[in-house]
Amino acid sequence: MIVLVVNSGSSSIKYQLLDMDNEKVLCKGLAERIGIPGSRIVHKKDGEKFVIEHPMANHDEALQLVLQTLKDEKMGAIKDFKEIDAVGHRVVHGGEKFSGSVLIDDEVINAIEEFSYLAPLHNPPNLMGIKAIMKLLPGVPNVAVFDTAFHAKMPKKAYLYAIPYEYYEKYKIRRYGFHGTSHRYVSRRTAEILGLDYNKSKIITVHLGNGASIAAVMNGKSVDTSMGFTPLEGLVMGTRSGDLDPSIVTFLIEKEGLSPEEVYTILNKKSGVLGLTSNFSSDMRDIEDKALENDPLCRLVLDIYEYRIAKYIGAYVAAMNGVDAISFTAGVGENSPITREEICENYLSYLGIKIDKEKNNVKGEERIISTPDSKVKVLIVPTNEELMIARDTKEIIEKGIKKLEY
């Protein structure tokens, strides 16, 4: 089965074409700067990179060009669009309605539109991609895989905020969590690597990219996660503040004469690592480099970053009453030996964790980095959200079902 995976953003579209008989990536790419000057597709096949400079006024035009690229004699991997058996779409927010991946129909499209108020920057462009593909590939089934779905069945004690209950009833204000597809892939893969029964395991997944979140996965289910109503809650991130006292918002509005929208922008785009370093960088690689050169501010920022992560890990050990394994993933999680080592050695030794420094001193390679006698196993597991989306798509189509429950 050939599955096309589409991740449609506001001005870019990531795509992968996979042969799901062997889970091989046939080709992949990124259509970027959609609707603005300088639009292009960066396409990769068999390790070779192609750059296609071409105007793309909207998502329809971008995906039309992507499809043409997929069947191009030199760059493509198919000869006819009929070879594409199904399309899997990343959708950021599924609200409370979707706790698993679903076959897309009019009802699903309406629901994604309905939840756009919860993810105004993400759901509308996700929908543009879905509608464009349905127009360009009529008759090909489409599947939606939601970032929030893995966390949708968290217990109420984990997802409700201690605010008047009527706001949950009226507006569905609750903790939703994000990066669900990544947490699901990494936790499953962790169990496979260690030979654990996924449905009888306690795994903490640590997704550290520019956006970052942690999940407690108990017996194959997400029971808690650090992001909340929006992706702003939780860890210190590249440009996001993570947890903070809500009264800071009203304080800044009053003292700085800012609008609520301006404060929201500050907390989302100008805070986190970027804000703490006075706009030096939002990239943890830059912070680490400076910290290793004994820059006091960057050393402090690295400490704050690691401390917040360690606190959440400790909280989730308590939430699950134990832990079998901790897995690091995404840009920082996969590629920062110093962050992994310092979190584990400075804060988690009470769990009986011991890190093998030689095994830890790698980047982006799947492996166990704890010692054989470590009471809790620690791993690097590179995430693969596209493969997870393709697997869900294949399962729904092959089984002829409308919904896949996790």
Curated annotation (Swiss-Prot):
Mg(2+) binds at residues 7, 385. Pathway: Metabolic intermediate biosynthesis; acetyl-CoA biosynthesis; acetyl-CoA from acetate: step 1/2. Mg(2+). Can also accept Mn(2+). It is found in: Cytoplasm. Disulfide bonds: none annotated. The active site is at residue 147. GO terms for molecular function: acetate kinase activity; ATP binding; magnesium ion binding. Substrate binds at residue 90. Its cofactor is Mg(2+); Mn(2+). Keywords: ATP-binding, Cytoplasm, Kinase, Magnesium, Metal-binding, Nucleotide-binding, Transferase. ATP binds at residues 14, 207-211, 283-285, 331-335. SUPFAM superfamilies: Actin-like ATPase domain. The keyword Magnesium applies. The record marks 179, 240 as: Transition state stabilizer. Its EC number is 2.7.2.1. It catalyses: acetate + ATP = acetyl phosphate + ADP. One of its GO terms (cellular component) is cytoplasm. Homodimer. Catalyzes the formation of acetyl phosphate from acetate and ATP. Can also catalyze the reverse reaction. Belongs to the acetokinase family. This is Acetate kinase. It comes from Thermosipho africanus (strain TCF52B). The gene is ackA.
